[in-house]
A protein has these predicted regions:
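A "functional boundary" signal
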Residues: 1-170
Length: 170
């Protein structure tokens, strides 16, 4: 496996950053650069994995859960990057929560918990401001998704405890 050229890495990263920046502002403006990053990533598999996470988010927001699931699952074959894998885990948690697939929800939740522990143990790896933003967002989203799940199960104390774990400085 070769190393991606710097030009490709910078281009794909810029597309992914644009997709991420628009995710809650304009879904179309998020989708288009994510699709472009996915299609143009040749050797930069981590960038393609990030594009998958952005595309999975868009599909989820459009309530196309089958497509979102397929896209998120593709991440596992593209990278070993714990952040991208964590984001895919959380995306799948959200899908399985919405579709009532409790076993699958817990499988990916347990995977996310293990990844979060590894990320915390090796937090010096994430020095880039954008990466830190994504780490903080992923952790926050994990606790929100967990809280909603507990709330649906009428486990209010657990739901509140999960919300209390959201880092305030994130």
């Amino acid at each position: 496996v070769g190393t991606a050229p710097t030009k490709e890495v910078r281009f794909i990263d810029s597309l992914n950053r644009r997709a991420y920046a628009y995710r809650y502002k304009n879904l179309d403006s998020s989708y288009l650069p994510a699709e472009q990053a996915y299609g143009q990533a040749r050797l930069y598999q981590q960038g393609k994995a990030e594009a998958c996470n952005n595309l999975g988010f868009c599909a989820f927001m459009q309530m196309d859960f089958e497509r979102a699931e397929k896209i998120y699952k593709e991440v596992y074959g593209l990278t070993k990057n714990e952040l991208e894998l964590l984001i895919a885990d959380i995306g799948l948690m959200k899908i399985y929560q919405r579709t009532g697939m409790n076993k699958e929800y817990y499988d990916y939740r347990n995977s996310a918990v293990r990844r979060m522990k590894r990320i915390r143990e090796d937090s010096t790896v994430f020095t880039d401001k954008y990466e830190m933003l994504r780490v903080n967002f992923a952790f926050t989203e994990f606790f929100i998704v967990s809280s909603v799940y507990y709330y649906y199960l009428q486990q209010r104390p657990e739901a509140m405890a999960s919300l209390d774990k959201i880092p305030l400085d994130a």
